[in-house]
Amino acid sequence: RREKFIPQIMMSARAVQDGIDLLSPLIVGPDVLSLSETVVLGTVSGDIHTIGKTLVSIMLRSAGFHVVDLGTNVPPEKFVAAARENNSHIIAISAMLTTTVTGMKKTIRALREAEESDQWHIIVGGAPVNGRFAREHNAEYAADAVETVNLALKACGIDPLPDEEL
């Protein structure tokens, strides 16, 4: 049978997170390109999933971005405040649960209603969203961490890096 129990899933997720924590300093070392741009990154309110967001953070840092990781279960106003405080032009929003799509919509709306909205590039990703969702909500969609990096580079006016350089 292909059944999985919640404790097994939780232990697996913890093991992956521990591996990421261990390997991250080796992936994002002193030799990476240094960009002046900051990316604000977080998982929307109501969602506590972190592995995908953490992988995106590592990829962005390895491409030279400074990343402000807001964590999980982040309310819309915290995304807005962090973008302002860090003078960021790129905000990456993650969700894993279909039940948190409403939270993503609220977050995008809060960012678009802010006076700085014309300066902000909003990138969305995660299981419950797609390109159509992003277009309908005036955002860009990244299917994976590499695409997130390429969209962030594009927002800075930099050509995307070939996959082997990420």
PLM feature segments, named:
Residues 1-90, 95-166:
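Domain-level signal for soluble alpha/beta catalytic cores
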